[in-house]
């Protein structure tokens, strides 16, 4: 954590966890020590100007952010849920490379009065779930909650990280699970639901770490996580690889719609291309995982992007331009 920053405006009546940043950092330090234990000899975690960690080569490095009003609504998610999501979506990028996370730092920008310990508890809970140690971060003021997480990871074995650019014509396409659950969960929350599997999928996404490592062991040619909707992320993989794609179906989560599966986003299932489907299935079985779901194939026609022989709708979310992909100007 970096040094204290002035808190704008009067602090009378502000929750102590924000009015006194040093005290907040001290409580977060105790929280991380309770969950992760003391750092190994030679490492420094939360509390200094920078963390000191042992790294392996090659090092995986990814960052992601969640923003109030874009990625979550506090009417539907607790602060702990927000912290969980912030770390998990960054860890998902490590999973998409076939790696496993090691350490994370988290910046929390929050309005006055925000219970930052609850946010930190959610981050730490996810860190414990994904074996990712929280080793530092920053705390500052903002008009809305923004959490930015940077995660490091490593690769087991000698195989290289899996990129999204390695697919070739003839490769078969798979996903690790049904899609659309998060979007359906948000829809249910807006309609008054407060619990259920779909709501859980929206509030507490899962990173497919075991699946990503199994896919890498199976020699998949390309892989990425489905964060912005299958229709959009599939186009990204196809563009990076210089291939077309032809889907024969979309696995829709129970209670979700096909539109939510194609464009809802925040599923964090893994999209994989492989030249050896049997090897992929065997790797998943050996790891005790549910079988990957076959959805289509890569083609030589780079302009092809079809679903059941028809042009696939351009659904998904473009965060940089702040509107659904279907509303992009051509």
Task: List PLM regions with ranges.
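Glycine-rich anion-binding loops of enzyme active sites
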Residues: 56, 66, 100-187, 297
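Acidic, Ser/Thr/Pro-rich beta/coil linker or hinge segments at domain junctions
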Residues: 3, 7-9, 203-206, 282-330
């Amino acid at each position: 954590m970096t040094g204290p920053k002035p808190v704008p405006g009067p602090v009378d009546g502000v929750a102590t966890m924000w009015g006194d940043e040093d005290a907040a950092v001290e409580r977060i330090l105790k929280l991380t020590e309770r969950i992760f234990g003391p750092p190994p000899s030679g490492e420094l975690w939360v509390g200094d100007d920078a963390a000191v960690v042992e790294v392996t080569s090659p090092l995986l490095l990814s960052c992601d952010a969640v923003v109030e009003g874009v990625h979550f609504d506090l009417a539907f998610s607790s602060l702990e849920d927000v912290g969980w999501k912030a770390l998990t979506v960054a860890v998902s990028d490590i999973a998409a490379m076939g790696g496993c996370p090691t350490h994370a730092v988290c910046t929390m920008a929050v309005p006055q009065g925000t219970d930052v310990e609850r946010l930190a508890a959610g981050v730490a809970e996810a860190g414990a779930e994904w074996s990712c140690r929280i080793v530092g971060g920053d705390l500052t003021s903002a008009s809305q909650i923004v959490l930015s997480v940077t995660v490091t990871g490593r690769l087991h074995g000698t195989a290289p990280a899996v990129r999204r650019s390695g697919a070739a014509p003839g490769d078969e396409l798979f996903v690790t699970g049904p899609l659309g659950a998060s979007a359906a969960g948000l829809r249910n929350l807006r309609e008054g639901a407060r619990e259920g599997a779909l709501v859980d999928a929206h509030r507490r996404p899962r990173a497919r770490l075991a699946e990503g490592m199994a896919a890498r062991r199976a020699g998949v040619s390309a892989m990425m996580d489905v964060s912005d909707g299958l229709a959009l992320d599939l186009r990204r993989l196809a563009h990076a690889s210089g291939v077309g794609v032809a889907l024969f179906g979309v696995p829709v989560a129970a209670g979700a719609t096909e539109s939510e599966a194609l464009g809802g986003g925040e599923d964090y299932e893994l999209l994989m291309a492989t030249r050896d489907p049997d090897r992929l299935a065997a790797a998943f079985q050996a790891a005790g995982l549910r079988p990957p779901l076959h959805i289509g194939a890569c083609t030589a026609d780079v302009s092809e992007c079809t679903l059941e022989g028809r042009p696939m709708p351009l659904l998904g979310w473009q965060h940089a331009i702040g509107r659904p992909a279907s509303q992009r100007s051509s």
